[in-house]
């Protein structure tokens, strides 16, 4: 699927864009249209937990409830399947004790726990807000490989330009209320943006020349 990196200076609405896609916030105008039965996983920049969980409960048990809220037999089968995969992901993110209480975690550990839950969710679309925050180099390299092999669509906000360049195949730039899209990685985006700005300057120069001629005509 597409792996889209969302970039722009702070305050331009990158995180808000992810929240709108996730359905956490509503648009002031217009509509966001999603296909039916699409599963979306959202990693906020600062995760908030609605109650006390152990790491296992949040990453595995809550995941099972989302997938099959009513069927106990199916839930047990899915839980058995997810447990092994969850342990692999958690281990890669630096966790060894799946019974640990999340309320005792640091902010960085909470972010990694929320990331693990997103990656395990089997979603069609991953929305990740600064996923490499609090990750060391080994964890970042592992996440890069995971996302490259991920079959769904990815929309990601990150200030890690190197990670962005390696993972994403499309760039969406939020700039002064506009969204510019580029079918390329970050390196290609820099080149295409430079071309767009050069073209804009050329157009501005042409408009300025027209205005100068108008002024000259008025002064005759």
What spans do the regions from the language model cover?
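Short cytosolic helices in intracellular loops of multi-pass membrane proteins
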Residues: 205-220
């Amino acid at each position: 699927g597409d792996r889209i990196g969302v970039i722009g200076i702070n305050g331009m609405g990158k995180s808000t864009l992810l929240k709108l896609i996730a359905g956490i916030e509503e648009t002031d105008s217009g509509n966001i249209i999603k296909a039916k039965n699409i599963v979306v996983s959202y990693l906020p920049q600062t995760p908030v937990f609605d109650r006390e969980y152990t790491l296992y409960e949040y990453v595995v048990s809550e995941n099972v409830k989302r997938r099959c809220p009513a069927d106990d037999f199916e839930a047990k089968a899915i839980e058995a399947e997810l447990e092994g995969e969850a342990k692999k992901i958690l281990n890669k993110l630096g966790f060894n004790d799946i019974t640990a209480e999340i309320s005792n975690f640091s902010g960085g550990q909470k972010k990694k726990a929320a990331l693990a839950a997103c990656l395990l969710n089997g979603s069609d679309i991953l929305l990740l807000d600064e996923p490499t925050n609090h990750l060391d180099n080994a964890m970042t390299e592992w996440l890069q490989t995971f996302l490259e092999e991920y079959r769904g669509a990815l929309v990601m906000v990150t200030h890690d330009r190197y990670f962005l360049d390696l993972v994403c195949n499309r760039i969406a730039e939020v700039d002064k209320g506009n969204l510019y899209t580029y079918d390329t990685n970050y390196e290609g985006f820099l080149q295409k943006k430079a071309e767009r700005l050069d073209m804009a300057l050329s157009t501005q120069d042409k408009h300025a020349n027209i205005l100068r001629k108008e002024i000259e005509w008025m002064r005759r």
